[in-house]
A protein has these predicted regions:
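An anion/pyrophosphate-binding glycine-rich loop and adjacent beta-alpha core
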Residues: 38-40, 46, 54, 58-61, ...
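Short hydrophobic core segments
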Residues: 7-9, 34, 137, 156-169, ...
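A glycine-rich dinucleotide-binding beta-alpha-beta segment and adjacent secondary-structure elements
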Residues: 133, 305-385
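A conserved short coil-to-beta-strand element within the FAD-binding core of flavoproteins
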Residues: 133-146
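A conserved FAD-binding loop/helix module that cradles the flavin
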Residues: 162, 166-180, 384-412
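Glycine-rich active-site loop/strand segments that organize a redox cofactor
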Residues: 49-100
Length: 425
C-alpha cells in the first residue's frame, strides 16, 4: 500500500494518537503534526494536576458512555473498538507503568505527566512523524483531491492528501471546520467551579467533605444530582461533585449566566428525621456542652461551626438551650444546605468546553467527515465532553486511534521522496 501525505492539525493527545495510529497502520504515510503553540501536548502536561489522568478504570463501554454529558451515544460503538483497557495496554506495552487509584482514575506510576508526553513523542519520532511547533494554520482549502494548508510565516502552503483536525477547543479549529461545510455547536465552558458569594464559607477554604449529595437547580430545568467529594475554596465550592454538575449542566448554566442554586446534603447516609433525632439526643445527653464545639456527626469542625453560625446559634450556646426552631433549622441545613451560585470559577487544570463539530456530520466508524472527503476529526474539536479529565483524555485516545485507522485506509496515492520534502518540510 503506497503512502499519502497526512497533515494533523493540533499537537495534543488526539492529534498525536491519530498520527501514531496512522503511521503504524501504513509506514509509508508521510505524517506531519502541526501545533500552533510553542510546546506539544501542553494540555496533557497539566492534566490531573501535572500527574496526567490518563484514563478511567471503566472497561464496559455501556457504563463508560454514561460519563459523557455530550457524545456518549456516538462513542458507544467507538469504545467497543478502543477503550480504557486498550489505552492502558498501549502505554504499558511501551514501558509506561500505570496505576489505578481508589476513585478509578488511572495515572502513571511516576505521577508525572512528562512520562506520558515522552512516550508519545518518542513513539511519533520512531515512526518518522514530523513534529512542528509554532505552526499555526491560518487557512485550509480543498483543491481537487488535495488540501492546501496555509501556515503562519510560511510562504507556500503545505499540501496534504488527507487532514486530521484535532485542534481541541481552539476557535481557529472550529473556523476551519465550518469553512469546509461543518456545523459548529456553539462552545461553552464545561468542568468549572461555582462562585458562592459567602465570606463565612470562603473563610473555610481548604475544607473537604466526602461523600456529599449535591443537587443543581436551575430555572425551567430538571434538577441534576451527583454524589462525591466537595471542596470549599477561596471563591466558593469545587471538587469532583461540583465539576460533574458543571459538566452536565454546562449549557443550561451558560444560558442562565451561571446563576442557580446548589443544594448540598452533607449527611447523605442519614434521613432528615435521623438528623433531627441525633440533635435531640445531644440536647438530652450533653446539655452543658457548647453546640459549636460538639458535633455529633462525622463532619469537619469548621463545617459544623459554619452551619451553627449560619442558622444563628451563638458560639457559646449550650445544647440545653437549643430551641426547637434552631434544631429544625440546623437539621435542614445539614440535610439541604442551600447556596446561591453567583457565577463560575476557573478550573485551569482540566479546562474543557462542550460544543464543537456536530456529531451527525462525522462517521464514527472512521472519524471521517460526512461533508468533506479526506477530512477527519478527533478529540475535543467534536461536540464531546466527559465529566473529568480522564474521560476526556479517553475520548481523545479513542477518536484519535479510530481516525488514524481511517486516515490510513485506502492509501493508494503515490508520493515521491522529493515531492514529500518539498511539500511537508
Amino acid at each position: 500500500m503506497a503512502g499519502q501525505r497526512i497533515l494533523v492539525i493540533g499537537g495534543g493527545a488526539a492529534g498525536f494518537f491519530g498520527a501514531i495510529a496512522c503511521a503504524t497502520a501504513n509506514s509509508r504515510n508521510l505524517v506531519t503534526i502541526l501545533e500552533a503553540g510553542a510546546t506539544l501536548l501542553s494540555k496533557v502536561r497539566i492534566s490531573g494536576g501535572g500527574r496526567c489522568n490518563v484514563t478511567h478504570h471503566c472497561f464496559d463501554p455501556a457504563l463508560l458512555v454514561q460519563h459523557y454529558p455530550r457524545g456518549g451515544k456516538a462513542l458507544r460503538g467507538a469504545f467497543s473498538r478502543f477503550q480504557p483497557q486498550d489505552t492502558i495496554a498501549w502505554f504499558e506495552a511501551r514501558g509506561v507503568k500505570l496505576k489505578t487509584e481508589a476513585d478509578g482514575r488511572v495515572f502513571p506510576v511516576s505521577d508525572d505527566s512528562g512520562t506520558i508526553i515522552d512516550c508519545l513523542v518518542q513513539e511519533a519520532t520512531a515512526l518518522g512523524i514530523r513534529l512542528r511547533t509554532r505552526a499555526a494554520v491560518k487557512e485550509m482549502v480543498k483543491v481537487g483531491n488535495e488540501f492546501q494548508v496555509t501556515v503562519a510565516q510560511q510562504p507556500q502552503p503545505l499540501v496534504g492528501d488527507r487532514v486530521l483536525l484535532a485542534t481541541g477547543s481552539s476557535s481557529q479549529g472550529y473556523r476551519l471546520a465550518a469553512q469546509l461545510g461543518h456545523t459548529i455547536i456553539p462552545p461553552v465552558p464545561s468542568l468549572f467551579t461555582f462562585h458562592i458569594d459567602d465570606p463565612l464559607l470562603q473563610e473555610r477554604s481548604g475544607l473537604s467533605v466526602e461523600p456529599v449529595e449535591a443537587t443543581l437547580k436551575l430555572l425551567q430545568q430538571p434538577p441534576l444530582t451527583q454524589t462525591g467529594a466537595i471542596l470549599v475554596t477561596h471563591w466558593g465550592l469545587s471538587g469532583p461533585v461540583v465539576l460533574k454538575l458543571s459538566a452536565w449542566g454546562a449549557r443550561a448554566l451558560a444560558a442562565q449566566n451561571y446563576r442557580g442554586t446548589l443544594v448540598v446534603n452533607w449527611l447523605p447516609h442519614l434521613s432528615l428525621p435521623q438528623i433531627q433525632g441525633e440533635l435531640a439526643a445531644c440536647r438530652s445527653h450533653t446539655p452543658k456542652r457548647a453546640i459549636a464545639s460538639h458535633c455529633p456527626f462525622p463532619l469537619p469542625r469548621r463545617l459544623w461551626s459554619y452551619w451553627t453560625t449560619s442558622v444563628g446559634i451563638p458560639a457559646e450556646q449550650t445544647w440545653a438551650h437549643l430551641s426547637k426552631k434552631q434544631l429544625l433549622a440546623l437539621a435542614e441545613a445539614l440535610h439541604r444546605g442551600t447556596f446561591a451560585i453567583a457565577g463560575k470559577g476557573a478550573f485551569k487544570e482540566e479546562f474543557v468546553t462542550c460544543g464543537g463539530v456536530a456529531l451527525k456530520e462525522v462517521d464514527f466508524r472512521t472519524m471521517a467527515s460526512r461533508c468533506c472527503e479526506g477530512l477527519f476529526f478527533a478529540g475535543e474539536v467534536l461536540d464531546i465532553d466527559g465529566v473529568t479529565g480522564g474521560f476526556n483524555l479517553q475520548s481523545a485516545w479513542t477518536t484519535g486511534w479510530i481516525a488514524g485507522q481511517g486516515l490510513a485506509e485506502g492509501s493508494t496515492g503515490t508520493v515521491s521522496a522529493g515531492a514529500s520534502t518539498a511539500t511537508l518540510s
